[in-house]
Swiss-Prot record:
UreD, UreF and UreG form a complex that acts as a GTP-hydrolysis-dependent molecular chaperone, activating the urease apoprotein by helping to assemble the nickel containing metallocenter of UreC. The UreE protein probably delivers the nickel. It comes from Brucella abortus (strain 2308). It is found in: Cytoplasm. Pfam families: UreF. The keyword tRNA-binding does not apply. Belongs to the UreF family. PANTHER family: UREASE ACCESSORY PROTEIN F. Required for maturation of urease via the functional incorporation of the urease nickel metallocenter. Disruption of the ure1 gene cluster suggests that it protects brucellae during their passage through the stomach. The major route of infection in human brucellosis is oral. This is Urease accessory protein UreF 1. It comes from the Bacteria. One of its GO terms (cellular component) is cytoplasm. The lineage of its organism: Bacteria, Pseudomonadati, Pseudomonadota, Alphaproteobacteria, Hyphomicrobiales. GO terms for molecular function: nickel cation binding. Keywords: Chaperone, Cytoplasm, Nickel insertion, Virulence.
Length: 228
């Protein structure tokens, strides 16, 4: 059967697809993950809006957010060039630094793969159904011809928004604090998306060790709201 892939050169269509795929209501289960933030709050490392903003900006610039953006960009390029996606998928899975981080990225990736099939595309024939979330997002965006810079900016913003939503449930800040942080993070997201668009696999690397340790410690946390 021939699959017609709706490649878009229309910026409005690209925007609508990104808003749909990375919306908090897109069925990937992102609301159930805190990426270790819950443990950081529990241990007193993030106690207010200022600390939360600092936590997020370093995850994006030098932590798991950055690595995911690099993986997303490489997956986008593989999709655009018609290259095999299995190698990047295996690397992305191997980079998950803890059991819950692995669960978070793999379950979201699989859910994204399934839900995004509502937009038919040949990329689903080349993409492993069990793949990490940034690989799934990057490959699908590339398969549909969504511009890379826009895809990366939207991906990073969705990453932060999910943790901001978690911060409200954790009583770190309220809605006014969240909107202020969203506005303050715009330059960080734009700059990081631009860097990631020009990145290669050699640019992978993280320096947010405390955040990684919090994700590990969360695995044994007795009382919790989130799966990670």
């Amino acid at each position: 059967m021939t699959i017609i892939t709706p490649i878009t050169n229309d910026p409005t269509t690209a925007l609508l697809r990104l808003m749909a795929w990375l919306s908090p209501v897109f069925p990937v289960g992102s609301f159930s993950y805190s990426h270790g933030l819950e443990r950081a709050v529990h241990d007193g490392l993030v106690v207010d809006a200022a600390g939360l903003q600092d936590w997020l900006q370093w995850l994006v610039r030098r932590g798991s957010g950055w690595n995911d953006a690099v993986l997303c960009a490489e997956s986008w390029r593989c999709a655009m060039k018609g290259e095999d996606l299995h190698e990047i998928a295996e690397l992305a899975e191997a980079l998950a630094g803890s059991r819950e981080r692995h669960m978070e990225t793999m379950l979201q990736g699989g859910a994204f793969f399934a839900a995004a099939r509502s937009w038919p595309c040949e990329i689903f024939d080349r993409l492993p159904p069990d793949c990490a979330y940034p690989v799934a997002v990057g490959a699908v965006a590339g398969g549909h011809g969504v511009p890379l810079a826009q895809a990366l900016a939207a991906f990073l913003q969705a990453f932060c928004i999910n943790l901001l939503q978690a911060s409200i449930r954790l009583s770190v800040t309220g809605q006014s604090g969240v909107t202020a942080i969203m506005a303050a993070l715009e330059p960080v997201l734009g700059e990081t998306a631009a860097r990631a668009a020009l990145s290669s696999m050699e640019d992978l690397g993280s320096a947010t060790f405390i955040a990684d340790i919090m994700a590990m410690k969360h695995e044994t946390q007795h009382s919790r709201l989130f799966r990670s």
